[in-house]
């Protein structure tokens, strides 16, 4: 009898030990978004991005996807104006990896097939020369009316170059380090009302 109790006790100890060693594994992460809100309906020119950009690496093409980035433009009309011009220029476009590698990606910006560069202005509207802005044409029609006019259009954003460490350029994006890159892409808009 003592042997049976001892054997049952040992089986229970071994069984209990096995259960104690099998533990659930859980993981938790917290995502935090920075948030701001802004309303400006009085400035002569207001440009508002409509969304954010997210580039994903695709192994099949060894590259990143491109993105359409929409924006809203609002202008205050000037009843004395005889012409209107709207231009854009790239200000910042570098994303930096969020680790110690220093890897960078440069974002290219196109407007209707024309590159938006840091070195010069891209003409979006120029009523004096017959450039009426495509999707932005309501601005070309409303610049000389004494109220606000809005229109929406978009840029095409794509990854155009990168580095593995901030200096060594890559020609094959598959050689980039794994990770996440972050930064700002900023485009300056200039509007001119000619009287």
From Swiss-Prot:
One Pfam match: MatB
Key words of the record: Fimbrium, Signal
Keyword presence, Signal: yes
GO cellular component, one term: pilus
Stretch forming the signal peptide: 1-22
Annotated compartments: Fimbrium
Induction: Negatively regulated by H-NS. Positively regulated by IHF and EcpR.
Subunit structure: Self-associates. Forms filaments. Interacts with EcpD.
Identification of the protein by name: Common pilus major fimbrillin subunit EcpA
Gene symbol of the encoding locus: ecpA
């Amino acid at each position: 009898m003592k042997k049976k109790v001892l054997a049952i006790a040992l089986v229970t100890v071994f069984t209990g030990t096995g259960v104690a060693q099998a533990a659930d594994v859980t993981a938790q992460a917290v995502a935090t978004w920075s948030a701001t809100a802004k309303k400006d309906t009085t400035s002569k020119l207001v440009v508002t991005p409509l969304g954010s950009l997210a580039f994903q690496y695709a192994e099949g093409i060894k590259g990143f996807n491109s993105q359409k980035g929409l924006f809203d433009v609002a202008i205050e009309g000037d009843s004395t104006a005889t012409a209107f011009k709207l231009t854009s220029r790239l200000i910042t476009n570098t994303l930096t990896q969020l680790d110690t590698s220093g890897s960078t990606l440069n974002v290219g910006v196109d407007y209707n097939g024309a590159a938006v560069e840091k070195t010069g202005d891209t003409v979006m509207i120029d009523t004096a020369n017959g450039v009426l802005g495509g999707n932005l044409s309501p601005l070309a029609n409303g610049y000389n009316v004494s109220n606000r006019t809005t229109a929406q259009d978009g840029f095409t954003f794509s990854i155009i170059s990168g580095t593995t460490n901030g200096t060594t350029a890559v020609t094959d994006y598959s050689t980039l380090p794994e990770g996440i890159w972050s930064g700002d892409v900023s485009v300056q808009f200039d509007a001119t009302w000619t009287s």
